């Protein structure tokens, strides 16, 4: 008993792949028992597996953006990583790549792909699921469906921002309070 809670040698495996109790016979067996139950306990091992899977999905002539911050975040979100590649409508590439990347990275935790020669953003992404799906095409389709409205929002705001020249916004900057005690 610790802090009023009972503890023991049993834990649960991955909630989809092995949703059963497993018994850990010794501290040294902990990682292996959970690996058999489809949970990668070692954060560095999980991170390396994600990086390997994501990189493997880039085609020849493509470079995947493996930013440390996104890789760390995704590593913390999954127990049994399975990387999948999806795509989006190339028409969205008329929006500045920074806006598209932000939508993919911040909202959906997707890794984006660039052309190896030109550096241009490609209409593709890589997501990391927490399951090895029996129907990966459906998982990809769902992710493609989810990113579409995010990219549409980015296109909408970019289009609206282009309606007014940048200089016309300068006047309003004087009334923006960045920090209450520092003024405008």
Task: Identify the meaning behind each predicted range.
Residues 1, 184:
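Hydrophobic/aromatic pocket-lining and membrane-interface residues
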Residues 2-161:
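His/Asp/Glu-rich acidic catalytic environments and adjacent acidic regulatory segments
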Residues 92-99, 128-131, 167-183:
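Active-site flanking loop/helix segments enriched in acidic
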Residues 160, 166-167:
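Structured, charged N-terminal subsegments at the starts of enzyme catalytic cores
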């Amino acid at each position: 008993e610790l802090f009023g809670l009972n503890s023991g040698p049993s834990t649960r495996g991955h909630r989809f792949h092995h949703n059963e109790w497993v018994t850990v016979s010794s501290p040294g067996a902990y990682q292996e028992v959970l690996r058999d139950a489809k949970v990668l306990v070692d954060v560095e091992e999980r991170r390396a597996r994600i990086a390997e899977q994501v990189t493997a999905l880039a085609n020849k002539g493509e470079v995947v953006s493996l930013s440390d911050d996104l890789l760390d975040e995704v590593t913390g979100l999954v127990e049994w990583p399975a990387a999948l590649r999806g795509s989006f409508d190339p028409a969205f590439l008329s929006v500045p790549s920074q806006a598209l990347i932000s939508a993919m990275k911040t909202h959906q935790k997707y890794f984006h792909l660039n052309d190896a020669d030109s550096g241009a953003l490609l209409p593709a992404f890589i997501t990391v699921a927490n399951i090895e799906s029996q129907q990966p095409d459906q998982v990809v389709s769902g992710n493609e469906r989810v990113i579409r409205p995010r990219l549409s929002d980015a296109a909408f705001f970019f289009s609206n921002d282009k309606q007014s020249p940048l200089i016309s916004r300068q006047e309003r900057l004087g009334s923006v309070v960045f920090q209450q005690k520092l003024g405008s």
